[in-house]
Swiss-Prot record:
Gene giving rise to this polypeptide: gloB
Protein name: Hydroxyacylglutathione hydrolase
SUPFAM superfamilies found in the cross-reference section: Metallo-hydrolase/oxidoreductase (SSF56281)
Cofactor note: Binds 2 Zn(2+) ions per subunit.
Source taxonomy: Bacteria, Pseudomonadati, Pseudomonadota, Gammaproteobacteria, Pseudomonadales
Species name: Pseudomonas aeruginosa (strain LESB58)
Catalytic activity: an S-(2-hydroxyacyl)glutathione + H2O = a 2-hydroxy carboxylate + glutathione + H(+)
GO term, biological process aspect, one: methylglyoxal catabolic process to D-lactate via S-lactoyl-glutathione
UniProt similarity note: Belongs to the metallo-beta-lactamase superfamily. Glyoxalase II family.
Coiled-coil positions: none
Length: 258
């Protein structure tokens, strides 16, 4: 049984910590800062960091990789088509890799960056570590990719089993939900989610992980084929958007300025 906890970093990052109590081995996802991981290891001296999983090359996701590799000798996994510090295993779409006894499938999900990958573990309760591609009620900015690429990447993730747990890497949920409410003010599920997320953050509690089912009902970037979302995008752009990709592009540009 793998336990998953979040180690906060910077202002709003989460470094996901996977723990196998049987072997006393652990793994981390996107350690942008080594210090939170080093502190956890110091508090748990009988545990060993065996793997470091990286989704993309941005500094707030890889800044701690080299130091942790030097400290622990952990294996570093990352996208083949990006420059990842101290990488041991370069991963491409469709490959499978075993971490702490779990087999993860690699998805290439370009958009936020061109080489971005996600790690998916199919199980009774599937796990998805998706970096800055899919957020709770949102998606990543398009620093390198196109709207069409990101739309395709999100559609791929949206097709995963509804109970898939979504481990993204930023506490952006409330700001994303405010935008989602601007897009769909009459979405009852969205209003309920906003109220719940507000209660959690007022108690300084994490709003993650999410689930694919929740994203399908409340994330505007996964709802670009819904009439209510298309109508709002048409109003925003002043023209008829004929494809889901066009609707997505309007929403992403709007969110960038929201």
């Amino acid at each position: 049984m793998i336990q998953i906890d979040a180690l906060p970093a910077f202002n709003d990052n989460y470094i996901w910590l996977l723990q196998d109590a049987t072997s006393r081995r652990c793994a981390v996802v996107d350690p942008g800062d080594a210090k939170p991981v080093e502190a956890w290891l110091a508090a748990h001296p009988d545990w060993r960091l065996s793997d470091i999983l990286v989704t993309h090359h941005h500094h707030d996701h890889v800044g701690g990789v080299a130091a942790l590799k030097e400290l622990t000798g952990a294996r570093v996994l990352g996208p083949a088509n990006e420059k990842i510090p101290a990488r041991d295993l370069a991963l491409e779409d469709g490959e499978r890799v075993e971490v702490l006894g779990l087999v993860f499938e690699i998805f290439h999900v370009p958009g936020h960056t061109l080489g971005h990958i996600a790690y998916y573990h199919p199980a009774e309760t599937p796990l998805l570590f998706c970096g800055d591609t899919l957020f709770a009620a949102g998606c990543g900015r398009l620093f390198e990719g196109t709207p069409a690429q990101m739309h395709h990447s999100l559609a791929r993730l949206a097709a995963l089993p509804a109970n898939t747990r979504v481990y993204c890497t930023h506490e952006y949920t409330l700001s994303n939900l405010r935008f989602a409410l601007a897009v769909e003010p009459d979405n009852a599920a969205l209003r309920e989610r906003f109220e719940e997320a507000t209660r959690l953050r007022e108690r300084d509690r994490i709003t993650l992980p999410s689930e694919i089912s929740l994203e399908l009902s409340t994330n505007p970037f996964l709802r670009v084929s819904e009439k209510s979302v298309k109508k709002k995008a048409d109003q925003r752009s002043g023209q008829q958007n004929r494809t889901p990709e066009e609707v997505f592009a309007v929403l992403r540009a709007w969110k960038d300025q929201f």
